[in-house]
Amino acid sequence: MIPVTATLIRHRLRHLRHRIRFKSTSVSPFHLPLNHPTYLIWSANTSLGKTLVSTGIAASFLLQQPSSSATKLLYLKPIQTGFPSDSDSRFVFSKLDSLSLRRQIPISISNSVLHSSLPAAKSLGLNVEVSESGMCSLNFRDEKTVTGAPELLCKTLYAWEAAISPHLAAERENATVEDSVVLQMIEKCLKEEMECGVKSEKSDLLCLVETAGGVASPGPSGTLQCDLYRPFRLPGILVGDGRLGGISGTIAAYESLKLRGYDIAAVVFEDHGLVNEVPLTSYLRNKVPVLVLPPVPKDPSDDLIEWFVESDGVFKALKETMVLANLERLERLNGMAKLAGEVFWWPFTQHKLVHQETVTVIDSRCGENFSIYKASDNSSLSQQFDACASWWTQGPDPTFQAELAREMGYTAARFGHVMFPENVYEPALKCAELLLDGVGKGWASRVYFSDNGSTAIEIALKMAFRKFCVDHNFCEATEEEKHIVVKVIALRGSYHGDTLGAMEAQAPSPYTGFLQQPWYTGRGLFLDPPTVFLSNGSWNISLPESFSEIAPEYGTFTSRDEIFDKSRDASTLARIYSAYLSKHLQEHSGVRQSAHVGALIIEPVIHGAGGMHMVDPLFQRVLVNECRNRKIPVIFDEVFTGFWRLGVETTTELLGCKPDIACFAKLLTGGMVPLAVTLATDAVFDSFSGDSKLKALLHGHSYSAHAMGCATAAKAIQWFKDPETNHNITSQGKTLRELWDEELVQQISSHSAVQRVVVIGTLFALELKADASNSGYASLYAKSLLIMLREDGIFTRPLGNVIYLMCGPCTSPEICRRLLTKLYKRLGEFNRT
């Protein structure tokens, strides 16, 4: 048993090395024209005929009458093992040469090998230099040129000598290639040919990228190829298996690709006389064409030319399917912006200010990046970093996104949807256990599930008010005594959601005005909080007017850590805060007009929608203590700030105090699906206990604790805090490492265009200097900067004159550094305008 165990450990360590290398390699944003069809050629397993299919498609495309000099096919083989004795690009090259002679249609053909391992290069008899990665750049090219003829370009990008899986070949031949390098080389080759094709309106170009082995075969880094090529999300052709057992293998391969978000235009396989196409067509419900090729001759001496001639009708049908699918895709993408403006009612959007050309068409997402379609840019796809974290919800990198997709698929297949009251099922139970052992550890004992952050707040308010009434004996009062007014104490600038109760619990703002909410009255005591920010390289405190006389004494901090230092509790400022809060709470103690402060609700540390302001944590901590001394239940609204958004799993670790009730959503599920929870103490739960159902908490949603959301949340909670999966977790396991480059942060905070900076955890925000007319939520002052950042591949959406960049808990600091570098450069241009 010992040798087996050691082998397994070595395998796991090697796998982790591969995975770490993939995750730490940040892929530069790509830019791919879509005006010519480009397809990935997949197969359900190795040796099923991918290269035969590529050759047949090439012949059908190039060897047609009448031929055209503007017709070109690019065949890329990114990863080739067994080279040079085995070369798929050479096979396509030689067969097209023979087929062109057979059909008497001249074509220009070339075959190039760009890089190989040293053993592979030596097998070619080449004397080459070896790079640090162990790969050699080759000047290997074979070509036959015919002027004015269609053109075939075959390119092998990376080759190894051993006829084994690429990850083993790379390891054994000491010649590694990072995933990002493979993708960048594919992009470069595709763009070179496509941009040449754009110059001629009559050009006709088809690009094939043939994978190695099966759908889930590893690439040279160990990353599965279905994950390796996912950033491009090119449509695919799946070469299935016509043999006994091939139905299962083909379906498994198809499902693996669909689960990762690939589109498959057709399935094609060799006929083995088992009629596999019938059950496959039935399974695919005619959504995807299933094409059958004649049996391939088994005689090694057969040059297959007659087989290609016999298969011509199938390959023509396949080619036409590919061309049509690409046209339909482009037609849909080109029409989406216009149609969206006609049928959508976007939230937080003045439609009169949105022009069709400014609508962002999102084709897909991979990790932190959108794939954006631009019809005006040669019908191209380009990547943009989602600096809004899709409105503050997103956390996954590409690896975690695929993991969550699998978890969601499994749970949907197992449970569909089941109702929650008086029921238990594994995803909900596991999620609740993880919540109580994580963000609720040390204080919470109950988990109440709901749909989104705002509904979680509604539930929290009901919980808090009931607890307050029980503690102050209002529940047993006479009918006359029950005519009391229960309000909240909250901070100006906080935002707790769009539902009616949540809006009542926040101070007047653009979100609560008469045009937005005619019922709004503002049922609370709303206080102006002290805020902290970075400016000119120093952390400063901004005190409300009521504290203005002490501003000079408490103006700056040496570091952000000092702001959160618990030793500040013994400071003079803490005593001033306490006296100020005690005075206001006493004035609204309920003596007058039967009004009572029945709950405290705060966004801990950061006011998000209110402008990304950092509230002095000392002030919030003192406020919590003052309310607790008066038996006023405390609600933490961690919908935005929870689950590592601010660098810790829960802001209780930053504030140094705990609530009675807390709300979580957004990053709870990694941002993949809506789900919210309201956590509460035993004492809060007990305030709803009684013999009558009328004393229970009568609030719920049809999708409360939906299995898919709970399973996704459980996976996200575990993933974010595990150092093996999230390499940003520090050795203590309680905080994220610093993601934003300190020197760049300091430089930006000192920029003449910048009023203030807030940086913590996954959040970087700045307020642009602007006069009163250009400040606030309705301001369009940042529009030109927004446009420049999107040109740089950064998708951001401002809060008036506040610009923010938001990454995920797993985002590489190198990516964050690149974002800040681009922002700093654009700030200079913005300032000049």
UniProtKB/Swiss-Prot annotation:
Disruption phenotype: Arrested embryos at the transition to cotyledon stages of development. Biotin depletion leading to lethality; this phenotype is rescued by exogenous supply of biotin.
Keywords: Aminotransferase, ATP-binding, Biotin biosynthesis, Ligase, Magnesium, Metal-binding, Mitochondrion, Multifunctional enzyme, Nucleotide-binding, Pyridoxal phosphate, S-adenosyl-L-methionine, Transferase, Transit peptide
GO cellular component terms, A-Z: mitochondrial matrix; mitochondrion
Database matches in InterPro entries: Aminotrans_3, Aminotrans_3_PPA_site, DTB_synth_BioD, P-loop_NTPase, PyrdxlP-dep_Trfase, PyrdxlP-dep_Trfase_major, PyrdxlP-dep_Trfase_small
Swiss-Prot/TrEMBL site (Participates in the substrate recognition with KAPA and in a stacking interaction with the adenine ring of SAM) positions: 348
Stretch list, region 7,8-diamino-pelargonic acid aminotransferase: 332-830
Reaction catalysis annotation: (7R,8S)-7,8-diammoniononanoate + CO2 + ATP = (4R,5S)-dethiobiotin + ADP + phosphate + 3 H(+); (8S)-8-amino-7-oxononanoate + S-adenosyl-L-methionine = S-adenosyl-4-methylsulfanyl-2-oxobutanoate + (7R,8S)-7,8-diammoniononanoate
Residues given in the record as Mg(2+) binding sites: 51, 88, 210
Transit peptide: 1-23
Binding site residues for pyridoxal 5'-phosphate: 453-454, 637, 701-702
Needed cofactors: Mg(2+); pyridoxal 5'-phosphate
Main location: mitochondrion
Domain of life: Eukaryota
GO biological process: biotin biosynthetic process
Entry's localization field: Mitochondrion matrix
Sites bearing N6-(pyridoxal phosphate)lysine, chain numbering: 666
Chain residues that bind ATP: 47-52, 97, 210-213, 270-271, 518-520, 545
Pathway: Cofactor biosynthesis; biotin biosynthesis; biotin from 7,8-diaminononanoate: step 1/2; Cofactor biosynthesis; biotin biosynthesis; 7,8-diaminononanoate from 8-amino-7-oxononanoate (SAM route): step 1/1
Oligomeric and partner information: Homodimer.
Family: In the N-terminal section; belongs to the dethiobiotin synthetase family.
UniProt protein name: Bifunctional dethiobiotin synthetase/7,8-diamino-pelargonic acid aminotransferase, mitochondrial
Organism annotation: Arabidopsis thaliana
The encoding gene: BIO3-BIO1
